[in-house]
Amino acid sequence: MLFLSAPLLAQAPAIEDPAHNELRALRDGLQDAIRKGDIERELSYLHPNVIVTWQNAEVSRGRDGVRKYLERMLNGPAKIVKAYRSEVTVDELTALYGSTTGISYGSSHEHLDLMTGTSVDFTARWSATLIKEDGKWLIANLHASSNLFDNPMLAMAKQMSYIIGGVCLLAGVALGFLLGRRRKAAR
């Protein structure tokens, strides 16, 4: 009898750690705050001593550092980004280390409307270290990056180099034609 029940026992689903629902709530709350442009609410999901490495390789330390970065990029007099959207996907459940530390990673689909009028869509990768402090999960470290060899900024630079090259070629042909005509007229 025990032999017959072994396959049933092997198929029993693993019990998921309740921490994962708490972490999903953090993710959903943070995404909602980002969608609404609520910087102060975004900061409430970050540890006071958070370290964030942004896509442009800038590093912000602490909630104040993150606030300054976001204000400068999104709201300041010299802001760079007019509008921002992001959809975050987690690759798998957070790897938990004990009951108060976790590491999560995944991808995000980003859309930026820049102040220059350019819109940029790209996929990024991210990783985060999360800690549970006073019963609440917080992001202690966040790192975001994009593909160095295949990204929209590189594509725009490549396109611009083709345009500039074409304009220079046409200008060179026109200048050569004009100089050639001048020499003929001088004879």
Residue ranges and their predicted role:
Residues 46, 56, 106-108, 126-128, ...:
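A mature extracytoplasmic/lumenal domain signature
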Residues 5-7:
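N-terminal signal peptide c-region/cleavage motif recognized by signal peptidases
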Residues 11, 123-154:
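Short beta-strand edge/turn micro-motifs at domain boundaries
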Residues 36-54, 61:
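Short, well-ordered alpha-helical segments enriched in acidic and aromatic residues
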